């Protein structure tokens, strides 16, 4: 509803596809609050996700479409099919940029082999720097942009978190490894 009242040209809309809860697929992702979530990067699912997003957001295009979780190890949804579906959506003007989250250097190369990859989204912060070893050099080589997520480690690096800070039961921050007592103290000493 909010998008109905916003000048679309002043907003960058990005969304993700590839997690499926409408129907069962061969690749289980996880169960959340009793809802089973599957991974599905088939062309049919990607196109359905985009059409649903366009309708819900009252827009004719998405600026960035990310695949949320990759599935190449399962051999069920060929990367070529995933990329071709995204390229088709881009050619139709329904998406402007192709993105991928939770990738490896090989997956980045695969996207570029079968079509195009404009941007990846990976966890990157002062504490989580694994992207620097392979992903950043690969992206630099292939001209792929990088968008960091969780650069402040869910608030831990803001300087506002103390050893006395608690989070509500069920908060995802309780499961982050940095919030375990000993690691939490070490990190806070650095901040």
Task: Describe each PLM feature range.
Residues 26-130, 134:
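Glycine/proline-rich, positively charged
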Residues 1-21:
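N-terminal binding-site loop/beta-alpha segment at the start of enzyme catalytic domains
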Residues 179-186:
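Conserved small/polar residues in nucleotide/adenosyl-binding loops
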Residues 14-15, 100, 146-148:
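Hydrophobic residues in well-ordered beta-strands that form the structural core
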Residues 132-171:
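Aromatic-lined glycan-binding groove of carbohydrate-active enzymes
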Residues 17-19, 104, 124-128, 150-157:
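Glycine-rich beta-alpha junction loops
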Residues 190-191:
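Hydrophobic alpha-helical segments, chiefly the membrane-spanning helices
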